[in-house]
Amino acid sequence: MANPVAKRSFRLRLHVLGSKLHKWLAIFVGLQVLLWMGTGALMSFLDLEEVRSEHVISRAAQTLPDDAAIPRWLSDSDDITAITTRVLDGKTVTEVRRADGAVSLHEPLSGRILSPIPAATARSIARRAWVGPQTSIHAARLVDESVGTEFRGPFPAWQITYNDVANTRVYVDASSGAVLSARSDTWRFFDFIWGLHIMDWTQRDRINSWWLLLFGIGGTIIAISGFVLLANRFPRTKRRARHGQVAR
């Protein structure tokens, strides 16, 4: 038969150990756990369509005319992986993708190269893409390197800034004329709290950092030690209730 004194002693030691673990880890990990819960709630609250600026930026392809010219000047090229004839900024163009990843735009009949597109064309593409409240374009600049966490390529690309309340920017591929991404203050706020959530405060694209792993394990231990403390309290509560009934 188990020794009741030894059993109580073991429970007491377990309770003390669980209490210490719970207390010190809660102090160390508690703030980040609070940030996880708070940032998770905020991200759930934000409308993903608004974060992506889909309510003001359209990426729908323009319809290709029935009489569009079919390019014949590319038949002798071996390194081409894709040829697409489409409408860009109201004009028919042929997009050529090559094995090395290069993209170029051409005049369909002559093959005259049209890329990289100039600032005026990038502005016009951005104006056509805008479907929000009436606004104008504030600035256009060519970027060939990452713009913080806001845009990481491909490069070169045109950064077009609108005169709207959300400080919206679109990035237009200088090689293909495609609208690559749209960023606004809502997206920047979402990106900031995402960085807090995954504990990557600079690049905000690593979800397996040592910081996140360490605090994740710490949070798990807090939960387990909390259950240990709770389990050790239940028998005491029952014994107190039983002794109270006997006393009566």
Regions found by a protein language model. Name each.
Residues A2-R248:
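Conserved histidines in hydrophobic membrane contexts and catalytic metal-binding motifs
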